[in-house]
Every structure is written in C-alpha cells, then in structure tokens.
C-alpha cells in the first residue's frame, strides 16, 4: 500500500497534513511531477515539494520530463526516486526523459507503464526499447545509457524503487523465485549472442516461454497455465460493452 498525492492541485495545508499522516504510517508516497509544459507553466511540483521539505527516499516521482536542472539536483540531494513511463512521454508529447542525467546524479530510477489507457499496452520489452531510444534522442549519445543499464532499470532497479529489492528483482538465494524464460532460438532473436541486447532491442512477449512468480508456474511452453485467456477476453468485452451502454455512448 502507498499514497498518491498531487501538491499544486490541492491547498498546501491539505497536502502537508496528508503527507504527515502517511509518513506516520510508514507508507511510501508516489507523485506525478513535471509531466507536461502545461503543468510547469502553472506550478513546479518538484520545487514546491523541495521547499516544503517533503522530498525524500520514500517518495517516487513519476515522469519529470520537464524538470529543470535545479529540480533534478533537488531530487538527487534528497535521494528522491523517479519512475519513468516512456510510452506516456511519447504518446502525450510530454517531453524527452532526462534518464542519463538523472543516473549521473545518482537518482534511483525505474521504468513503468503509467497507464495502459494512454500507452496502449504493458509490454516491458517495448518499454525498455523505447526508453533507450528516447534517451538517445535526449542525449544525442548512443553510448550514454546502454542495453544492460536499461535491463537493470526494468528489473532490480524497479524493486529498489519500490523498496522490495530484498525480496525480488534479481536471481539471488533467499529471494522469491520470479523468473521469465525467453526463447533464444526464435527467428527474431537468433542467433543468441548478447543477452542484454537481445532482451532490450529484439525480444517480444511472443518469445516468453515460461513465467514463474514466487515459485508458481503461470506460463509454460508459451501457454498461460493460471487462467483461461479466452474467458478473460470475453468477460472484458462484456464489461466494456456494459459500461458503454450505461454511459449512453456507441458500442
């Protein structure tokens, strides 16, 4: 459990009290910040949080594509985390992420989907690939952040960002048995050579052979084992049509 807040949209007295109560419960805090030019024209959330002494290692900022150099410095100084959603950055023309700069400053970063409503899917292979490409465009340097670093952002750094790296995020004795096995002899990934390059720049969900979560096999030989995919799709379609009918829209 965590808390999602939006200082800048709510009165200072309200969000300060909210954060005080949430921190009293020991819960992590997530906060959208610097997503769009329109937002920073109204207020700069990161600067607001910094001046209110609210930033810290228990805070995860989402986006920050339009954070100023000074604001990125504030994040580094306070050890505030940053989760970057590259699909949102490109789909909404929000801006190019400052991934390379944030990593150089020592900011704990990770990758995220944000919302499938905006991004269209939750394919982490595509998210890794897009993040790498957007960073190339931002830095104009294809060597600044490379495939292995992107893979870390999607795995162990995601766990670190969420404060659960002691349980998941890497293949380590004592951690949960979370595994994704990718075929390396499929046409689009063969011949196998560089694991990080293969996963970040070539692999697709189709190439996933087996998925094990906390020791439970959820996918095997390319087939889902824990649910009936056809049933899920059918129920989702029924729910969608019912919602459209209630809203009075076309379906």
List PLM regions with ranges.
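Short, electropositive alpha-helical surface patch
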Residues: 18-23, 81, 85-91, 238-246
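Short, acidic/turn-prone active-site loops that include or flank metal/cofactor-
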Residues: 35, 86-91, 114-117
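Glycine/Thr-rich phosphate-binding loops of Rossmann-like dinucleotide-binding domains
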Residues: 70, 91-92, 190, 221
